[in-house]
Amino acid sequence: MSKNKVSASSGRWLKEHFDDKYVLEAQKRGYRSRAIFKIEEIQNKDKLLKSGMTVVDLGAAPGGWSQYAVEQVGDEGQVIACDILPMDSIAGVSFLQGDFREEAVLDALLERIQPDMVDVVMSDMAPNMSGNLAVDQPRAMYLVELALDMCRQVLAPNGSFTVKVFQGEGFDQYLQEVRNMFKVVKIRKPDSSRARSREVYIVATGYKG
């Protein structure tokens, strides 16, 4: 691809980003990313987060979901966040930087969570996209499998799970896997999710344990 094409594409993305009403509203309300409106819409419909809950936020940076979760769980609750990228501190959030695919990072994350179980696992993780669907989709599915495995390790009975998933190869099998583990499973496409994106959010409640 030529440099001019890349520049034109980048320019369109930047214009779309800065004209985006969700970007503008996030800035106005003091949130770190437009992604906050995705979890807010899920919360308004499904009421996953309640005062006093313990929440794990995977793929947390830059911190929009963690910011929102802290507001919902309050001073009696706890938010434990993890990301391979750095994240500026948020009051009430215990943040661990690292790749939890690595055993040492996973152990450190589990140490922060245990001995208590958690009420909600949420994941907005996505791989760095190459533009090659044959490469990107397996990477994305690998991450959502890791998030589901985290549920198996730390989620309390009747706990909840929400995860960003890209529709494509492996999606139907993954959805069935989630349905086997939870009593109620819904698929959400938040208004703030760009229409052209293949992303949807699986919202699962009533973990069978």
UniProtKB/Swiss-Prot annotation:
Cellular component per GO, a single term: cytoplasm
Listed EC numbers: 2.1.1.166
Protein origin, superkingdom: Bacteria
Catalysed reaction, written as an equation: uridine(2552) in 23S rRNA + S-adenosyl-L-methionine = 2'-O-methyluridine(2552) in 23S rRNA + S-adenosyl-L-homocysteine + H(+)
Keywords per UniProt: Cytoplasm, Methyltransferase, rRNA processing, S-adenosyl-L-methionine, Transferase
Residue numbers binding S-adenosyl-L-methionine: 63, 65, 83, 99, 124
Active site: 164 (proton acceptor)
Molecular functions (GO terms): rRNA (uridine-2'-O-)-methyltransferase activity
Cross-referenced Gene3D superfamilies: Vaccinia Virus protein VP39 (3.40.50.150)
Localization per Swiss-Prot or TrEMBL: Cytoplasm
InterPro entries with a match to the protein in the record: RNA_methyltr_RlmE (IPR050082), RNA_MeTrfase_FtsJ_dom (IPR002877), rRNA-MeTfrase_E (IPR015507), SAM-dependent_MTases_sf (IPR029063)
Family: Belongs to the class I-like SAM-binding methyltransferase superfamily. RNA methyltransferase RlmE family.
NCBIfam families the record matches: PRK11188.1
Protein task: Specifically methylates the uridine in position 2552 of 23S rRNA at the 2'-O position of the ribose in the fully assembled 50S ribosomal subunit.
Name by which UniProt lists this protein: Ribosomal RNA large subunit methyltransferase E
Gene field: rlmE
